[in-house]
A protein has these predicted regions:
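Secreted/periplasmic proteins
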Residues: 2-13, 17-114
Length: 114
């Protein structure tokens, strides 16, 4: 009985540690898009702070940081993609403006799940 209780306590403690562990960041290239109908069924415009990611669940919020200038923005995943070679995320026009990447069209970024 004591062995089972000890095992249960250890499992609960390990679950708590796993739940509080920091989520690893993803780094790569980002581009931006001008809006339209998304894979989630939502219609977005240029002014929303949204993004497309291949695997993150819809509704997930991520912090995107432009590695060349340090600017960051929080976006909500509402679409699938990007489908461009070498990219890890596509952000909305408004988010791209905040990241300072409108002129270049793409940027090297870090994506942190929030």
């Amino acid at each position: 009985m004591a062995g089972r209780l000890f095992a249960a306590i250890v499992l609960v403690l390990l679950a708590g540690v796993a739940a509080s562990a920091p989520v690893l960041a993803e780094t790569g290239r980002a581009a931006y898009y001008r809006g339209g109908r998304t894979a989630s069924g939502e219609v977005t415009g240029r002014n929303g702070y949204t993004a497309a990611h291949r695997t993150l669940p819809f509704g997930t919020k991520v912090l995107v940081t432009n590695m060349s200038n340090g600017l960051s923005v929080t976006v909500r995943i509402n679409d699938r993609g990007p489908y461009g070679r070498g990219r890890i995320i596509d952000v909305s026009t408004a988010a791209a403006r905040e990241l300072g990447m409108i002129g270049s069209g793409t940027a090297s970024v870090r994506v942190d799940r929030q």
